[in-house]
């Protein structure tokens, strides 16, 4: 085979490899769907919650299981203290909130031992009753992103293959920041509430039927029950709902107005 033909073959092979690589990224797994989670997930934060009246066929529950604070070269654990009541058949996601400089006022060391301790503590939440998925909630400063990426990579490697791994993401990350690309998670839930300075710009962006540029952010939405939002939701995506108080049966009516069946 002469040089010209060999070059054509190599280019064709590269094109095919690129095509299938793109297809693989587009069709990456979503273990949350594979595990049959309902389309609506109620966030249950650190307060007493009685969700036993909510239909587990329609609602899953993502509850705050623990808060982990990166302080210096240590990890400080604060477990959940408030009671959570759900139906026995409810699908549960254990949420770990990770905090650092905004809470402590000092930069964390971000060393390997901290990452390993985080992984160990997060893995333990999988042992809680009826938990079948994990979610990580954090605010990643630019200087912390490599640390969080390595944390998620190690966590995914240690988790059983079928267990979903979810994370929350600032909506601004989903619109114009590519650091989420290729993270080993099943979804990055865009937090479309309490957005501060970005609030109006992002809500206008979505109201004009624009979509998040990051594919991991196109599998779900995160909204608050007490914040008006005019964008039309893609009904194929999962909806995470935050309430600024304990959930009550009367909230179902408000849910019906905000969420598609």
Regions found by a protein language model. Name each.
Residues 61, 136, 188:
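Conserved, mostly hydrophobic/aromatic
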Residues 22-58, 62-64, 77-80, 90, ...:
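Boundary/entry segment of secreted carbohydrate-active catalytic domains
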Residues 156-224:
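Substrate-binding surface in catalytic domains of secreted glycosidases
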Residues 35-38, 71-185:
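Chitinase-like catalytic core of GlcNAc-active glycosidases
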Residues 1-11:
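N-terminal Sec-pathway targeting helices
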Residues 12-21:
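Hydrophobic h-region of N-terminal signal peptides that target proteins for export
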Residues 43-47, 66, 97-101, 139-141, ...:
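Active-site beta-loop-alpha junctions enriched in small/polar residues
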Residues 198-261:
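C-terminal active-site rim and adjoining tail of enzyme catalytic domains
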């Amino acid at each position: 085979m002469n040089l010209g033909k060999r070059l054509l073959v190599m280019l064709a092979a590269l094109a095919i490899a690129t095509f299938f690589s793109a297809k693989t990224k587009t069709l990456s797994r979503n273990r949350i769907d594979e595990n049959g989670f309902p389309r609506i997930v109620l966030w249950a934060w650190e307060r007493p919650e009685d969700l036993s009246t909510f239909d587990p066929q329609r609602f899953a529950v993502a509850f705050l299981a623990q808060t982990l604070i990166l302080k210096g070269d240590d990890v400080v654990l604060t477990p959940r203290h408030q009671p959570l009541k759900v139906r026995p058949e409810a699908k549960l996601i254990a949420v770990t909130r990770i905090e650092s400089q905004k809470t402590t006022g000092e930069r964390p060391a971000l060393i390997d031992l901290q990452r390993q301790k985080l992984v160990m503590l997060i893995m333990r939440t999988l042992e809680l009753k009826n938990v079948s998925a994990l979610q990580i909630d954090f605010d990643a400063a630019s200087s912390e992103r490599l640390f969080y990426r390595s944390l998620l990579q190690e966590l995914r490697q240690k988790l059983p293959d079928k267990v979903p791994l979810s994370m929350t993401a600032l909506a601004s990350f989903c619109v114009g920041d590519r650091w989420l690309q290729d993270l080993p998670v099943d979804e990055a839930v865009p937090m479309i509430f309490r957005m501060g300075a970005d609030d109006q710009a992002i809500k206008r962006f979505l109201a004009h039927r624009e979509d998040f540029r990051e594919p991991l952010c196109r599998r779900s939405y995160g909204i608050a029950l007490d914040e008006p939002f005019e964008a039309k939701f893609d009904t194929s995506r999962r909806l995470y709902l935050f309430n600024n108080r304990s959930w009550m049966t009367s909230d179902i009516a408000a849910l019906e107005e905000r969420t598609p069946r």
